[in-house]
């Protein structure tokens, strides 16, 4: 058996068993991993220009800004309602559109449903390409196409949901019991009809649970899409940070925190019933 360079430098330890037979125990790779990690960290610091001294000396500014946010400006709340509702609407509609549109694509990306390697590879490549596109970039592109406003934000969230749910869904489809599906096909049912009747009931609980989980995250993502003009809380958040009105920023963040907490609580309870 050929030995690696590491094993040649650090020979395996010989152990004697009770029956007298000797076996070799390879040396741990932990020291090598630690050296590589330290080297990569040093290289990253050099490339990025990270300065721990600046971080330590300026960390107090964070607490200064945090102090300016407390207490929040309560009388600014009436101006928050509409952008907050826009954020929720973008998240809900984008999540719904993306999760519905991706179902046929997830079906085409499943190897146990579609036996054409070309089709499966093409669908998975499409989902991978879309998944690598940052939501902010999608929103920025959408603003050039649809203009400023919530339509661009909704489109960006739908694109993200499409890619996120698509990968999870086709992986879930590939783990189902294929017996009912094959039986329906044997009786003459079409592939689509067999999929709807035999596969969908098996993946529906986890599919709905993942959609709810994705919606939770989309509410948070939607709140920053306003930085590229896609509507929602991000618009006024960017404005107030720019004007250094930190008390208003504190009120916006508090409203967002409460909203996300309520949505997550409801979603968590719903997902427990589904799974």
Predicted regions: what they are:
Residues 105-139, 168-171:
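Cytoplasmic-entry segments and transmembrane alpha-helices of multi-pass inner-membrane transporters
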Residues 1-96, 103, 108:
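N-terminal, non-cleaved signal-anchor transmembrane helix
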Residues 95-103, 107, 111, 136, ...:
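Hydrophobic positions within alpha-helical transmembrane segments of bacterial inner-membrane proteins
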Residues 81-89, 123-130, 212, 216, ...:
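Alpha-helical membrane-interface segments at transmembrane helix boundaries
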Residues 148-199, 205-214, 265:
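Membrane-cytosol interface at the C-terminal ends of specific transmembrane alpha-helices
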Residues 191-225, 247-255, 259:
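Transmembrane alpha-helices
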Residues 127-161:
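Generic hydrophobic transmembrane alpha-helix motif, especially the helices
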